[in-house]
Amino acid sequence: MSDKIGLYSGSFDPVTNGHMDIIARASQLFDHLYIGVFFNPEKKGFFDLETRINVLKEALVDYPNISVVSAADSLAVDLAKSLGVTHMVRGLRNPTDFEYESNLEFFNNRLDPSIDTIYFIAHNLMQPISSSRVKELIHFNSSIEGLVPQSVIKQLESMNESNQNL
């Protein structure tokens, strides 16, 4: 039997504990799970691509079957094909997410019908967490403790120290 290989893609700007919960659960189902960090032209960026990749790698250091990859200028399904992915992994917080994700699945399936999509429903405590809300809290200097992995907090502290030293 061939390996089950997953790809969980997103902008992860920043990665949240909601993302981390989906990643932890998905990592148990796949022989290998890729985390694809992408640029989303519909979203205003907070961390640059390299920083997002590094923050994710630090957050995922204890997961030996996970690799963080990027293909900023391509479709996730094209990256999936190039990596031999068998399943796309998607997280759902609410009906709006389902509508968006099922539309995305339709187009991914048209581009490569051999790649299936698996949906993970966010746990109740994770459903309200979004990168957009986290960025809003950061903007107003509010605590994001418990909403993001420590690697995000460390990165923000490092950025604040750098700005104070200018």
Swiss-Prot record:
It holds the Pfam family CTP_transf_like. Pathway: Cofactor biosynthesis; coenzyme A biosynthesis; CoA from (R)-pantothenate: step 4/5. It is found in: Cytoplasm. Its EC number is 2.7.7.3. The record marks H19 as: Transition state stabilizer. Keywords: ATP-binding, Coenzyme A biosynthesis, Cytoplasm, Magnesium, Nucleotide-binding, Nucleotidyltransferase, Transferase. The keyword Nucleotide-binding applies. GO terms for cellular component: cytoplasm. GO terms for biological process: coenzyme A biosynthetic process. ATP binds at S11, F12, H19, G91, L92, R93, E101, M126, Q127, P128, I129, S130, S131, S132. Substrate binds at S11, K43, A76, R90. One of its GO terms (molecular function) is ATP binding. It comes from the Bacteria. Reversibly transfers an adenylyl group from ATP to 4'-phosphopantetheine, yielding dephospho-CoA (dPCoA) and pyrophosphate. Belongs to the bacterial CoaD family. HAMAP family: PPAT_bact. Homohexamer. This is Phosphopantetheine adenylyltransferase. It comes from Streptococcus uberis (strain ATCC BAA-854 / 0140J).
